[in-house]
């Protein structure tokens, strides 16, 4: 605990880092709040339903509870593991906000209908955010998979990072059984998460913010 406290005290002493933390928190809050009316509009828009041959080999099954526990347990543990590294945590916030924006862009450009046989994903937290309305058209790409992969990228090398990678795979498979995403949604999600992180790191270098030699997994 003293190590975490010391890291944050030293981090907060530097004005640029302090301002960046506040900026990242504000941007993330604005993006998340903006996603609520955005997804409400997406739900009312017609889209194209894709044929996904992978579903021929995967029986539909409700895995809402497992998906819920994997995601939020991973997020909670991820934040705990990143607390000793404030700068890494801030970079994670920035990358997450950017990939949410990228999701909004791709959903706007690629209107899709949910897969046949979709089993509504029960998520009390998201349900609260979206005022109890079921969101089914947040397609291309999978936010759950991208979140898990971004967490994997942010964690330092070690057993927990390896477990996070396993979590990415399990999450993707569960979403396909749930029929809430097409296979392509799941496959491309890690690329968007990685791209968001690389863009954030490049922007930081461009404006003169260092990342203490940050390399994913180190």
Region roles according to the model:
Residues 32-33, 100-106, 168-179:
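Aromatic-anchored segments of alpha-helical transmembrane domains
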Residues 2-74, 112, 217:
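N-terminal transmembrane-helix/juxtamembrane module of multi-pass inner/ER membrane proteins
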Residues 138-140, 170-196:
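Interfacial helix-loop-helix junctions of multi-pass membrane proteins
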Residues 19-27, 90-98, 163-166, 184:
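Alpha-helical transmembrane segments of integral membrane proteins
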Residues 27-35, 39, 102-107, 192-197:
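Alpha-helical transmembrane segments of multipass membrane proteins
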Residues 42-53, 83-161, 168, 205-218:
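Membrane-interface loops
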Residues 75-80, 145-164, 190-200:
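Membrane-interfacial alpha-helical segments at the cytosolic side of multi-pass membrane proteins
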Residues 70-87:
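Internal transmembrane alpha-helix with an interfacial aromatic "cap," most often the third helix
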């Amino acid at each position: 605990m003293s190590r975490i406290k010391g890291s944050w005290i030293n981090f907060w002493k530097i004005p640029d880092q302090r301002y960046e933390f506040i900026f990242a928190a504000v941007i993330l809050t604005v993006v998340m709040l903006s996603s609520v009316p955005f997804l409400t509009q997406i739900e009312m828009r017609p889209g194209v339903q894709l044929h996904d041959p992978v579903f021929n080999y995967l029986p539909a099954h409700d895995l809402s509870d497992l998906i819920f526990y994997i995601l939020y347990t991973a997020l909670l543990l991820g934040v705990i593991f990143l607390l000793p590294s404030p700068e890494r945590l801030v970079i994670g916030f920035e990358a997450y906000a950017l990939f949410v924006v990228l999701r909004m862009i791709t959903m706007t450009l690629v209107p899709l209908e949910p897969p046949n046989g979709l089993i509504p994903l029960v998520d009390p937290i998201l349900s609260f955010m979206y005022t109890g309305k079921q969101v089914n058209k947040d397609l291309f790409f999978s936010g759950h998979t991208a979140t898990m992969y971004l967490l994997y990228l942010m964690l330092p090398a070690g057993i927990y990072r390896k477990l996070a990678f396993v979590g990415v795979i399990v999450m993707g498979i569960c979403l396909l059984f749930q029929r809430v995403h097409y296979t392509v949604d799941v496959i491309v999600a890690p690329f968007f998460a990685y791209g968001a992180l690389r863009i954030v790191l490049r922007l930081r270098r461009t404006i003169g913010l260092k990342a203490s030699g940050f390399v994913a997994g180190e």
